[in-house]
Amino acid sequence: MSMYNMDLDKVIRKINKKGARTVGLQFPEGLKMQAVKIAKAIESQTPATVIISGDPCFGACDVSDYKMKGSVDLIVHYGHTPLPLKYEVPTLFIEAFSNIDVKKDLEKCLEKLEDYSKIALVTTTQHLHLLNEIKDYLEDNGKEVVLGSSKNTKKGQVLGCNFSSIKNLDAEVYLFIGSGNFHPLGIYLF
């Protein structure tokens, strides 16, 4: 369906198991292009009607539960790692892991990292599943790699509202695995 694993089978199973009649979909900007395809798939494979949130979405702390309360039985929130928060509407988080092969890009990256020996590796939810592979590749090429973590993040993960996982890593350089400017800018400013 896309460059990301939208885990549609899991979504369909959850909707059918819950018996949800109306489902709200929420996406961060980079994944909104998938909204209509996903909505059509859900409506064709479940008895549910889908409402797509067009509001900006900046993270797991920005679920549209207050806006959708009373209108939907379930929210499917794409692109973020769940936080230990209480939501007004049952919410299913789909992290939307990237399907991209980063090997060729890592080879190019290695050239730019030539002058650095200790690298802090950071990413967003979409690439967390690749971190061990990337770390191994860099270490196999003579680099020392550090992964930080903090409360409410996984190892190597930064959130748009929480960059503390990169604190005190004592790295010479930060290697961000992801797309866009938002998270790298936050890393730079932190």
What are these regions (language model features)?
Residues 1-190:
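An N-terminal assembly and electron-transfer interface module characteristic of large anaerobic redox
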